[in-house]
Amino acid sequence: MNMKEPISIILLESALELVPKELWKHPAVVKNARRRGKKPGETLLDVSLHYHAMKKLKDKEKRGRPDIVHISLLNALESPLNKEGYLRIYIHTYPGHIIFVKPETRIPRNYNRFVGLMEQLLIHGKVPPDSDDPLLYVKTMTISDLLEKINKNGIILLREHGEKEKPENIVKYAVENNYAIGIGGFPHGDYSQEIISISKAEFSIYNKPLTTWITISRVIVGAEHLYNII
């Protein structure tokens, strides 16, 4: 199949955000921020550090897992699909931001360096902060706004209870209809009703829950097979 356009993958409602204001004074948040020489609101929410602070946080089961985005981006950006120029990946965060990622971006393999990079991005809006052509930049917009910006007709979802299908066929369906492919960027729970309501179709690649990074890797491999990249 001759692919004219790269496939677009959106990590949806990703568990990547700065510590929300209502948690700034919690001892666990203050302790971690002080240790790093930062203000509480300039640090990433991380359940491994802020578990007790997050107990009463809305949708706590979906939040505070920056490692999901880290591993997923490493998988995606190092893939043959991306190296051949046929992948565009976007990060939609739980608070409603969209992170635009240039295909040539090299994500730090070290998790602590990744955390620092994401904090810089969410504080300054782009990385590098003084660049006119940043590798990463963030905007506040809805998924519908993003789909319009990247000229997609809609979005399909990878969801546990979706129609069982092979990754290769899911990619083919998305490309033929000019749809983006949405994958949940959170550890537990389900998409919000807002996301579900705009999806054009829902698919599943396995009969049990899969991590985000396994799902994205399988979709990418499906695309690589479909377009004879590997």
Swiss-Prot record:
Alphabetized InterPro entries for the sequence: Alpha/beta_knot_MTases, Rbsml_bgen_MeTrfase_EMG1/NEP1, Ribosome_NEP1_arc, tRNA_m1G_MTases_N
SUPFAM superfamilies: alpha/beta knot
Any one GO molecular-function label of the UniProt entry: rRNA (pseudouridine) methyltransferase activity
Keywords in alphabetical order: Methyltransferase, Ribosome biogenesis, RNA-binding, rRNA processing, rRNA-binding, S-adenosyl-L-methionine, Transferase
PANTHER family documented for this protein: NEP1/MRA1, RIBOSOMAL RNA SMALL SUBUNIT METHYLTRANSFERASE NEP1
CDD domains assigned: Nep1-like
Identification of the protein by name: Ribosomal RNA small subunit methyltransferase Nep1
Pfam families linked to this entry: EMG1 (PF03587)
Subunit structure: Homodimer.
Species this protein is from: Staphylothermus marinus (strain ATCC 43588 / DSM 3639 / JCM 9404 / F1)
